[in-house]
A protein has these predicted regions:
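Conserved alpha-helix/loop element of class I SAM-dependent methyltransferases that forms part
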Residues: 19-38
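A short SAM/SAH-binding and catalytic strip from SAM-dependent methyltransferases
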Residues: 110-123
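A short acidic, Gly/Pro-enriched loop at the edge of an enzyme's catalytic core
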Residues: 99-111
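Conserved Class I S-adenosyl-L-methionine
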Residues: 184-243
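A short glycine-rich, Lys/Arg-flanked "PGG" loop and its adjoining helix->strand segment in the class I
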Residues: 124-138
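Short, glycine-/aromatic-enriched active-site segment of Class I SAM-dependent methyltransferases
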Residues: 144-162
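Class I SAM-dependent methyltransferase Rossmann-like catalytic core
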Residues: 5-22
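Class I SAM-dependent methyltransferase SAM/SAH-binding core
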Residues: 43, 50-100
Length: 243
């Protein structure tokens, strides 16, 4: 079984491909200071199977949403959900690389991205995605961050798997350095990790052993041993008027 097929099997029947929950997504959305009946244009980057996309569509009922991902498998899953919820007239999917957004400047009122910025790196994402934001538009990103001084185990694991992991303070400094107005942040609750890993472990038990599975199991082990060290953190910011 090659890596893409193994990946799909590992996440079979899971609405989320990383730690998170509807409650956390809605909390992040609540920081966005637009009326929920506004006619907005929204970009959901790294949408996966569409958990955040559908919540955005339900909250901003008069808005248009573009949901992009690199994997057509998950876009097909989301397309089915869009049809089932009669959202075809305002929610659209597109296979697109987040490193090369094919949109005009100042196109979106909101850019939303859960646990995806790490793919290109947080600093690069802040710089690149600002281009497509309208003035006074919101960028909401969840990003892996240190919550306290990490143990040797968690530091070794994450410096290997995501070298840009850093403290909340340093992430906020990057946001300000890029010229955004920093609004707020909040830390994902441990229950979001626990539920995600429980579902993932259940799927992994049905799959053959290989390096891919070994890496997943190591990630789970590191979290169980060091859950106070790190978490995903939602960062909420605005593109200031003069940019």
């Amino acid at each position: 079984m090659d890596i893409p097929l193994y990946f799909y099997a590992a996440f079979k029947d899971m609405d989320r491909l990383a730690p998170g929950s509807d409650k956390s997504t809605l909390k992040a959305i609540d920081y966005i200071d637009f009326n929920n009946d506004s006619q907005l244009t929204i970009l959901d980057i790294g949408c996966g199977a569409g958990a955040s996309t559908l919540l955005l569509a339900d909250y901003f009922k008069n808005s248009t949403i573009e949901a992009i991902d690199l994997f057509p498998h998950y876009l097909k899953v989301l397309d089915e959900k869009i049809a089932d919820n009669d959202l075809d007239n305002r929610v659209y999917t597109c296979q697109m690389d987040m490193n090369d957004l094919d949109y005009p400047n100042c196109e979106f009122d909101i850019v939303f991205s859960e646990v995806s910025a790490y793919i290109m790196g947080f600093a690069k994402a802040l710089k690149s995605w600002k281009r497509v934001l309208k003035q006074n538009g919101y960028l909401v990103v969840s990003e892996l961050s240190w919550i306290q001084k990490p143990s040797k185990e968690s530091k070794k694991f994450w410096k290997t798997h995501y070298s840009e992991i850093d403290t909340i303070e340093n992430k906020i400094a990057l946001i300000k350095d890029e010229g955004y107005e920093f609004i707020d942040y909040f830390i994902l609750p441990k229950s979001d990790f626990e539920d995600y890993y429980a579902n993932l472990e259940s799927n992994l038990r049905t799959l053959d052993d290989n390096d891919f599975k070994k890496d997943f199991k190591k990630e789970i082990e590191v979290y169980e041993n060091n859950s106070d060290d790190y978490s995903y953190v939602y960062y909420i910011m605005k593109k200031e008027v003069y940019q």
